[in-house]
Amino acid sequence: VQEHHITDESNQATAYRTDSPTTVRNNNPFLYKDPDNPYAVKEVVLPVGGIYERDDRKMYSYDFRLTATYNTTIKNAHIINLFAGMEVNSADRHNTWFRGWGLQYDMGMTPFYDYRIFKKGQEEGSKYYTLGDTYYRNNAYYFNGTYSYKGRYTVNGTFRYEGTNKLGKSRKSRWLPTWNISGAWNLHEESWFQKAQPALSHLSLKASYSLTADRGPSTVTNSRVVINAYTPWRPSAGDGESGLKIEDLENSSLTYEKKHELNIGADMGFANNRINLVVDWYKRNNFDLIGDVTTQGIGGIIKKKGNVAEMKSNGIEISLSTKNIKTKNFSWTTDFIYSHIHNEVSKLETSVRVMDLVAGSGFTLEGYPVRSLFSIPFMGLNEIGLPTFLDQNGDVSTTGINFQERENLSFLQYSGSVDPTDMGSFGNVFQWKGLKLNVFITYSFGNVVRLNPVFKSYYSDLTAMPREFKNRWMV
């Protein structure tokens, strides 16, 4: 339960009663002007009291899990571990929200309201209270098997079959099998490895290949058509009515976001494990990624959610840990982590606007990283000092840029990815008896950032000029 008490003398409640002088009254959006009276002026509709808001959220859920395990060792050489199970998840969520007008906190919590506050809300289409229910169901069946020969060679396999009511109606879309197969070779378990010890304390080589999946963003729920109630705008409260609108078109084939991943790595230790190094290389192929699909508008809206994209990525991760000093009362350890990633959108079945690509948050375009930033080419100043740019037609222009252009995007200049390509951390832990000090830094680079758009066509005397103005025409 969340309660919000907006008391009588609070700034928010006072704003509903501020109607002087005339300039303030005419620009105060919290006052009410009766549309039924052509000569009306804005009036106060919350003369006394404050506002009380309450938000109730309840959830009833249960989880049922059944598992079985089998472990055995044959002739002290063959180690077998088997694990199987099933899981059922259910969650029902209920939400209610309410706003009460005119609650007099200084008068014994007595409500006093003007009927016009409800008339104002009805004409604006705002809600007085809301109720909402969501239902989530998920079933999963899984199996895992591991075989190891004397701890030297290990093979592991996992299979999972999962279904959820969030995705499409067809069995192919709603249910998905995923799997993982991996293997490891512990070279330090070999008899000949003792010759390399303790300089090389341990060495393991590992590899895996898998198909994994994700249900996608929690906001995507259009495996069935999404229809919401709403109050259409009418010029007066007497003409008001309720209605239904299509929020999102049905996509019965909406399915999981999937990923194939190949991982190869090595785990090694040196100097009696005082130095440990882990190196992993991976290659990923993401497909059936969920995004907006541009439709012909036949269903009433031009966009719906669907599996529209594919992405390829690869990278390397390095982790180095050292025990620099180790005594009875004092120790000093260092950890260094570095990772590099490269990704590229290989398929994108949706349309993109110029505005999306030049926005500072980055956007997706086929053939480029997932969050790429583009720029409109700057062509210098013209003879009267105005900045000029290259437009979508290949012409140099000051005002001819069509930010809604979807077809001709080749004139844009690729600036880079807004996501870092290299990142990691460097930390040191000092421990003396019962005291511990952790000193660490994180770092990232390889990305670009759109500069703050501080330049405007109009400035008042109240505007503070930023330092970027000093070199405003330098490129």
How would you describe each model-predicted region?
Residues 1-12, 23-34, 40-369:
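Extracellular/periplasmic, surface-exposed regions of secreted and cell-surface proteins
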Residues 10-15, 98-103, 351, 442-445, ...:
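Short Gly/aromatic-enriched secondary-structure transition segments
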Residues 15-16, 469:
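Solvent-exposed, well-ordered loop and adjacent helix/strand elements within mature globular domains
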Residues 97, 221, 306, 325-418, ...:
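Conserved small-residue
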Residues 144, 267, 378, 387, ...:
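Short, surface-exposed charged micro-motifs
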Residues 415-452:
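Glycine-rich, aromatic-lined ligand/substrate-binding cores of catalytic
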